[in-house]
């Protein structure tokens, strides 16, 4: 009974707040002569702050046109803007900037939804050792990370040198599918210097603080390191969940002036991989068994950063030099 009453109160409170909000919107329009979309575009700076407010306004609107505008095809955005202007009785000649601002916001909103679909497609595609393209990507990853060490055979214990668990890496991609391989290859290719350093440090990340003699003298546990490829797949999972949950909207809406793409997602993965590596060393874990604790702490820190509407995770990161900060 108590549970039912609690649910009833929550439902009543929801509808009350919704009714109150509509009343406030009506009053504001009468006082300012502008609809909510106009007030947001004219009163909020470009970037995540504006786009997220526009997205909420469109999604919560009672108009079917506005509700569906967040999921239209990119080619239909321009016509959708015209329809919205007509619905709101806004003269585009008198308010030319409004159409431009709305279009920029919709490109980001629709682009984010499409990016989720693209990423999900890669995640759901399993690694297939009979697929020449998949095999080529995997062998390319080895060449990028170990340019001076030939791979003796396709199935080999050498894969452990770059952080896979066994003789055949295909089994390690089960959780994230091709997405994990795409991200690892992107990191190794687009930010080669950092990737090589992270790989080297991952074997024993404290080596930079001690000489080899000191390391052996202190009998340090080499397990303080981690498996580069496995952690890369794990960080891919982190990036994926941040994307699907909407947490990355703040970042993408601030760094992608139009629609965020798969490249933006991969650049974000590079940043997360680099930052996690530094965070791992700072945390100074006792052994690899502390990985889940460190990862969860890192995840919470990233989420906290993304709660800042002005946040852009990697505006100055090497792999992100092509991004434009709005």
Curated annotation (Swiss-Prot):
Nuclease in keyword set: no
Task: Identify the residues that the record assigns to the ELMO domain, covering every copy.
Answer: 133-306
Mind listing the UniProt keywords for this protein, alphabetically? GTPase activation
InterPro entries with a match to the protein in the record: ELMO_dom, ELMO_domain-containing
Q: Name one GO molecular function term.
A: GTPase activator activity
Tell me which GO cellular component terms the UniProt record holds. Answer: cilium; glutamatergic synapse; Golgi apparatus; synapse
Protein's GO biological process: cilium assembly; protein localization; protein transport
Q: Which domain of life is it from?
A: Eukaryota
What Pfam family does this protein match (any one)?
ELMO_CED12
Record carries keyword Transcription regulation: no
Please give the function described in this protein's UniProt entry: Acts as a GTPase-activating protein (GAP) toward guanine nucleotide exchange factors like ARL2, ARL3, ARF1 and ARF6, but not for GTPases outside the Arf family.
User: Which protein are we looking at?
Assistant: ELMO domain-containing protein 1
This protein's species is Mus musculus (Mouse)
């Amino acid at each position: 009974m108590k549970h039912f009453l609690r649910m009833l109160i929550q439902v009543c409170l929801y509808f009350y707040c919704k009714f109150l909000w509509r009343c406030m919107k009506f009053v504001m329009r009468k006082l300012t002569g502008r609809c909510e979309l106009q007030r947001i575009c004219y009163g909020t700076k470009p970037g995540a702050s504006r786009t997220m407010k526009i997205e909420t306004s469109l999604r919560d609107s009672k108009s079917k046109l506005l509700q569906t505008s967040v999921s239209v095809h990119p080619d239909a955005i321009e016509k959708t803007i015209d329809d919205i202007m007509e619905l709101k009785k806004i003269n585009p000649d008198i308010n030319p900037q409004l159409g431009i601002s709305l279009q920029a916001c919709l490109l980001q909103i629709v682009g984010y939804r499409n990016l989720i679909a693209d990423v999900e497609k890669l995640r759901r595609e399993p690694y297939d050792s009979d697929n020449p393209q998949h095999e080529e990507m995997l062998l390319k990853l080895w060449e990028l990370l170990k340019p001076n060490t030939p791979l003796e055979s396709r199935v080999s214990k050498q894969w452990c040198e770059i952080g896979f668990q066994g003789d055949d890496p295909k089994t390690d991609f089960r959780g994230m599918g091709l997405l994990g391989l795409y991200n690892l290859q992107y990191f190794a290719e687009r930010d080669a210097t950092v990737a090589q350093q992270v790989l080297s440090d991952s074997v024993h990340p404290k080596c930079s603080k001690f000489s080899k003699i000191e390391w052996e003298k202190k009998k340090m546990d080499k397990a303080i390191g981690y498996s580069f490829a496995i952690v890369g797949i794990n960080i891919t999972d982190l990036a994926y969940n941040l994307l699907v949950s909407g947490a990355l909207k703040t970042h993408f809406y601030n760094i992608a002036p139009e629609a965020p793409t798969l490249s933006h997602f991969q650049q974000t993965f590079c940043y997360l991989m680099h930052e996690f590596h530094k965070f791992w060393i700072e945390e100074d874990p006792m052994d690899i068994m502390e990985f889940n604790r460190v990862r969860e702490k890192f995840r919470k820190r990233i989420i906290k950063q993304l709660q800042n509407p002005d946040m852009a995770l990697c505006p100055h990161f090497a792999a992100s030099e092509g991004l434009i900060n709005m």
